[in-house]
């Protein structure tokens, strides 16, 4: 809802002129906008903005519509683009009697616009049109424009994310704070998974096996049936869709990461966890060489505060100290009886503090395989053979404010239990752990360099 002070501003200030351009898209983003309630769509276009051009909604058509577009070029306006652009093979989209390509019209409008907003995943990153093999060579508009573009991804984005981003510029005359992908931080700055109403079940290792099972109906996590929430940055659980009616995960289907780059190829079209057995594309993570952590990276770990308990029996006991953790350990025990029995047989209850990076990998290997890690290269090979690009998040805690950097990994072992119960395989766990170490060591290295 727009605050009273902002509403007063919109009442007395000249209305911001808005041009809404359609390129390679399905009009789903416009559909999302039409379902706004506070403000309603009619309030939005009559009281807050002056909608100068929108091919689906405007009364004018044909040459009259083209005349309106030419006229608006002489005035101040902001540009919202729905849909990707075919900038190479431009014949994939031609518009109007003059046969202009979508790319030509986009360039013409972008050159005059005070601000440019890519509304939806198609205009932000190319979207479904850019899915393999991408015959139209569609891409996001920022790839072909020299001007700054604010990305509002989603297939579609919520009405709130669209309206609030446009309204911010109309109110303040500047763009909102953006992340490294030029997305508004207020909307895309947090992981969707962390706001999900099903997260407690995720933390407990309670997963739906099928969409129609009792667990799913009772709020179980949908990770095992393909939810990609842990890899997605969006505020869907908070703002929802259709005037805050609901959102996909609450309605019973997993997130498909529709606001992420290349979502259709990398996330969206399979309802399984990202385990190698479900991969439909062959990918070798070439950056994970045999020397991945053998030299400089391990030296950095040796120079910082890095210590953890390495007795797995005690690790499991610590995880089980709270209600969610106790459920998680119990579910791990049920799903991996052999592994749990191996731990019970081979570990006592004496503390075993360790600073050894390889010991962390060995613990993780035991949790996955129920056996000791005989060759440390087996872990690296598994990570290299992971057939997906995206690591599953591990909650390492890096404190850069201490006398020397401190990397706390003590609570992260539970993530291995969670992912195993959720259907992730050894390759996925191995890759995710190594990427977590790599990312944190990179932060430490950058601090040392500065």
Feature annotation, model-predicted:
Residues 2, 263-266, 368-375:
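Short helix-capping/linker segments at secondary-structure and domain boundaries
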Residues 116, 299, 449-450:
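Short glycine-rich phosphate-binding loop at a beta-alpha junction
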Residues 1-236, 248, 264-269:
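Iron-sulfur-associated redox domains of electron-transfer enzymes in respiratory
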Residues 286, 290-303:
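Gly/Thr-rich phosphate-binding beta-strand-loop-beta motif of the actin/hexokinase/Hsp70
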Residues 241-287:
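Extended hydrophobic packing segments that form well-structured cores
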Residues 305-318:
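Catalytic cores of nucleotide-enabled group-transfer and carboxylate-activating enzymes in metabolic
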Residues 160-164, 310, 359-362:
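Residues on a specific face of well-ordered alpha-helices
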